[in-house]
Amino acid sequence: MKPSIYSLTRDELIAWAVERGQKQFRATQIWDWLYKKRVQSFEEMTNISKDFVSILNDSFCVNPLKQRVVQESADGTVKYLFELPDGMLIETVLMRQHYGHSVCVTTQVGCNIGCTFCASGLIKKQRDLNSGEITAQIMLVQKYFDDRKQGERVSHVVVMGIGEPFDNYKNVMCFLRVINDDNGLAIGARHITVSTSGLAHKIRDFANEGVQVNLAVSLHAPNNDLRSRIMRVNRSFPLEKLFSAIEYYIEKTNRRVTFEYIMLNEVNDSIKQAQELADLTKTIRKLSYVNLIPYNPVSEHDQYSRSPKERVLAFYDVLKKNGVNCVVRQEHGTDIDAACGQLRSKTMKKDREKVTATK
């Protein structure tokens, strides 16, 4: 199975081409074809010799993904189900915002973090995506825009899809370098957010990278007891370790951290828990932000339900009175399979039913 050429940074592409007797400018031409003209095959690169096109074809594919399902919401949100070369399925979501077009990418096939409310973890991690497979998600959404010929572009990226990005650290960092490259897609670092469930040692590594990419932490509980019950990762990285790493990140980067907090009815949404959350974030208040997220119910996790609006607002009010920067997240795609992992799970179930029916 040939790797995608999207898995190379520009410097890596230059080194690869030079090793094969090409001048540096040849790699620059190829890079332009990929990310500015956004061709789908090497044969479309008209200023590259046929001999070198043949070498490219022998070494790489361009986009390794196949589009299986597309769902479009009334609010313009588009959810894609892509098939990988080995037949596995991943999800990608395009969200239209007032400030631009944001794409949520997947980094792993399945997830081992084990959050008890999440559709992503219904299927255990089967493998990491390589950097080319992550980049390819952006490229196919950008192709959707290019085909519409309205001058639209992917302006923001959130690494919040299926999987734990910091459990696939090397490939995620390569992906970030590719999409941020000024000579390519040129998606600004401050328009990119990486979300982690709380791998404290990787937060420290990320702080040391020196990148301007935003960091979000999936918190979802204000104390160790509850967080360990609903997020298995907390047993390895309890709040003390997590917040030590977050404080290191803030000190090292002077950048704000966003805390994601899914509102689960009568689980983590009480007034007492709001005060606990305010107290937990007190020492980093100036450089932290809390995002309260309405829960998208998952049939396999029917022990959870969405917090009523009045409970969300009461929770929000406590945070605001304590000086916490916070917002209730605007929902997208509520009329389609909105929860992360839902579309993939449903499609896999249908595929299994088809196989069973033919036996």
Swiss-Prot record:
Where does it primarily localize? cytoplasm
- The gene is rlmN
User: Per the annotation, how and in what number is the cofactor bound?
Assistant: Binds 1 [4Fe-4S] cluster. The cluster is coordinated with 3 cysteines and an exchangeable S-adenosyl-L-methionine.
Question: Where in the cell?
Answer: Cytoplasm
One GO location term (cellular component): cytoplasm
Disulphide bond pairs? C104-C340
| The organism of origin for this protein | Streptococcus pyogenes serotype M5 (strain Manfredo)
Cited function: Specifically methylates position 2 of adenine 2503 in 23S rRNA and position 2 of adenine 37 in tRNAs.
Binding positions (S-adenosyl-L-methionine): G163, E164, S195, S218, L219, H220, N296
Q: Name one Pfam family in it.
A: RlmN_N
Which residues act catalytically here?
A: E91, C340
Query: Domain Radical SAM core, which positions?
Result: 97-329
Q: Which reaction does it catalyse?
A: adenosine(2503) in 23S rRNA + 2 reduced [2Fe-2S]-[ferredoxin] + 2 S-adenosyl-L-methionine = 2-methyladenosine(2503) in 23S rRNA + 5'-deoxyadenosine + L-methionine + 2 oxidized [2Fe-2S]-[ferredoxin] + S-adenosyl-L-homocysteine; adenosine(37) in tRNA + 2 reduced [2Fe-2S]-[ferredoxin] + 2 S-adenosyl-L-methionine = 2-methyladenosine(37) in tRNA + 5'-deoxyadenosine + L-methionine + 2 oxidized [2Fe-2S]-[ferredoxin] + S-adenosyl-L-homocysteine
Q: Name one GO molecular function term.
A: tRNA (adenine(37)-C2)-methyltransferase activity
> What name appears for this protein in its UniProt entry?
Probable dual-specificity RNA methyltransferase RlmN
Give the EC number(s) under which this enzyme is classified: 2.1.1.192
Coiled coil ranges (UniProt) are: none
* Cofactor(s) required, per the database record: [4Fe-4S] cluster
**Keyword terms of this UniProt record:** 4Fe-4S, Cytoplasm, Disulfide bond, Iron, Iron-sulfur, Metal-binding, Methyltransferase, rRNA processing, S-adenosyl-L-methionine, Transferase, tRNA processing
Q: Can the keyword tRNA-binding be found in this entry's annotation? A: no
Query: What's one GO BP annotation on this UniProt entry?
Result: tRNA methylation
Name the InterPro entries on file: Aldolase_TIM, Methyltransferase_A, RlmN_N, RNA_MTrfase_RlmN, rRNA_lsu_MTrfase_RlmN/Cfr, rSAM
A further note on this protein reads:
Reaction proceeds by a ping-pong mechanism involving intermediate methylation of a conserved cysteine residue.
The UniProt similarity line reads: Belongs to the radical SAM superfamily. RlmN family.
Give me the residues that bind [4Fe-4S] cluster, please: C111, C115, C118
Which SUPFAM superfamilies does this one have?
Answer: Radical SAM enzymes
Keyword rRNA processing among UniProt keywords: yes
